[in-house]
Design a protein with these regions (language model features):
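Short beta-alpha connecting loops at secondary-structure transitions
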Residues: 39-40, 245-256, 273-280, 360
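Short glycine-rich phosphate-binding loop at a beta-alpha junction
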Residues: 152-165, 280, 284, 309, ...
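Conserved phosphate-binding/catalytic loops in two-lobed NTP-binding clefts
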Residues: 183-196, 365
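Phosphate-binding loop and its immediate beta->loop->alpha context
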Residues: 32-182, 192, 263-297, 301-308, ...
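Conserved phosphate-binding catalytic cores of ATP/NTP-utilizing and phosphoryl-transfer enzymes
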Residues: 1-5, 190-222, 381-384, 391-397
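Extended, hydrophobic alpha-helical segments in both membrane/secreted and soluble proteins
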Residues: 172, 176, 180, 194, ...
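Gly/Thr-rich phosphate-binding beta-strand-loop-beta motif of the actin/hexokinase/Hsp70
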Residues: 2-29, 102, 206-247, 292
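Acidic low-complexity intrinsically disordered segments
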Residues: 186, 243, 313-386
């Protein structure tokens, strides 16, 4: 087998997937050119577009819902489901047929991750799939999109790296590897996401990273993703006269991220609707959550927009007249995210345990305290002595320090 021409990196995210790659024939040492694959996907029935991100959503349509050709892709005409942008937008109106957060379910030890349990609240007539199968379908789509764009360089012949949270337990890691193998990833390596972020920083420095750090520096890597928050500490040490990066600690698996923010925003909007005399049922609340996700992304990407209209369809016969209409404002978004998820706290603050209400979606053991800064304070407090036995670094904490002090974030 010849040496692979490309090194492919895949971010299998909770809410989005991405594929980047490097052509080894045009690389020279630490100077490389990284590219992102525009991923061909359906954005509406029969409408094909290539976008940098593949939304991590799977839509399972009713057998009579779409017409022939609506799900056709350049590489197949026999698909009975949709992944990506079409799945996300169509599923927002019919959430009982939408699979989301498959990555969170894949690391949930309290369920059979090979069992057909998603969508978790689908009625009996909706065929379900497993968290493992959902992941296989996302990874398969990425492989097929690559092969469509690079017919002269088959995916199976390239070196592939798939990122995972550092806090994934052995079972979740093995399930991710199993999904990749089932999707046709024959030359695959798993890489922890904080390490990937650090490698990206090193690569972008074009060899200059050694001038930006010194022995004793402690780098805090915070990865707030769609479904999880990953915390890692990496120390700069000296060994045999060379600077090295050594991982000191990895945080607990915290099921807390963008999904929780979307749920929180949906509850904020639902309370506003209730004050106006409109009560959203559970089905509408789920649809409202997806609408808030889209509105959140719009507000965060466009600083000139102050509010985004929200429309949640009714399940009754009067689909238009029965729709719920409201909006998400920038003020509501900012207050909910900053106060709820990133409050300013003392270093002694710790996550609060409480009954699982409000921000808990059926079946997923979300973190009971949404304050990411409190989880961070607890993590740094637990690691106060982490450098005491680390060779190659000479660093002392202030007298009476109660938490480990990072020098870079």
């Amino acid at each position: 087998m010849s040496d692979p021409r490309y090194s492919i990196g895949i971010d299998l995210g909770t809410t989005h997937c991405a594929l980047s790659y490097v052509d080894s024939s045009t690389s020279d040492g630490e100077k490389i050119v990284q590219q992102v694959l525009p991923i061909a996907q359906l954005t509406a029935p029969g409408a094909l577009e290539s976008r940098d991100l593949l939304p991590s959503f799977l839509y399972l349509p009713h057998e009579s819902e779409l017409t022939q050709g609506d799900l056709t892709l350049p590489w197949t005409a026999s698909r009975a489901f949709a992944v990506g942008e079409m799945a996300r937008t169509r599923g927002a109106g019919t959430p009982i047929r939408l699979v989301s957060s498959a990555k969170s379910w894949l690391c949930h030890p309290g369920v059979d991750r090979r069992a057909a349990i998603l969508p978790s609240d689908a009625p009996p007539e909706v065929a379900r799939v497993s968290p493992l199968e959902s992941s296989i379908r996302y990874l398969t789509h990425l492989r097929e999109a690559w092969d469509h764009a690079h017919p002269d360089a088959p995916f199976a012949d390239q070196d592939v790296t798939v990122t995972i949270p550092a806090s994934f337990d052995p079972a979740a890691r093995e399930l991710t590897a199993e999904a990749a193998r089932a999707a046709g990833y024959s030359r695959m390596t798993l890489l922890e996401e904080p390490q990937a972020a650090l490698y990206s920083w090193i690569q972008k420095s074009e060899g200059g990273w050694r001038k930006q750090v010194q022995v004793g520096d402690l780098i805090l890597c915070v990865d707030v993703g769609g479904g999880t928050t990953d915390l890692s500490l990496i120390a700069v040490v000296e060994r045999d006269g060379n600077l090295e990066l050594h991982r000191v600690a990895v945080g607990e698996h915290i099921l807390l991220g963008g999904d929780n923010m979307d749920l929180a925003l949906a509850h904020v909007v639902a309370r506003k609707l209730a004050q106006q005399g409109t009560q959203a049922d559970p089905w509408q609340l789920r649809a409202l959550t997806y609408a808030c996700r889209s509105a959140k992304e719009t507000l965060l990407s466009d600083p000139t927009t102050d509010a985004v209209p929200l429309v949640v369809p009714s399940r009754g016969s009067k689909l238009i007249g029965g729709s719920i209409r409201t909006e998400l404002t920038r003020a509501e978004l900012t207050q909910t995210i900053l106060e709820g998820f990133f409050p300013q706290v003392d270093a002694a603050a710790r996550p609060v345990s409480r009954a699982r209400v409000g921000l808990t979606q059926l079946g997923l053991p979300y973190a009971q305290d949404a304050g990411i800064t409190r989880h961070l304070a607890a993590f740094l407090g637990r690691q106060v002595a982490a450098l005491d036995t680390l060779e190659g670094v000479q660093r002392t904490l202030p007298q009476g320090a109660t938490f480990l002090h990072p020098t870079a974030v």
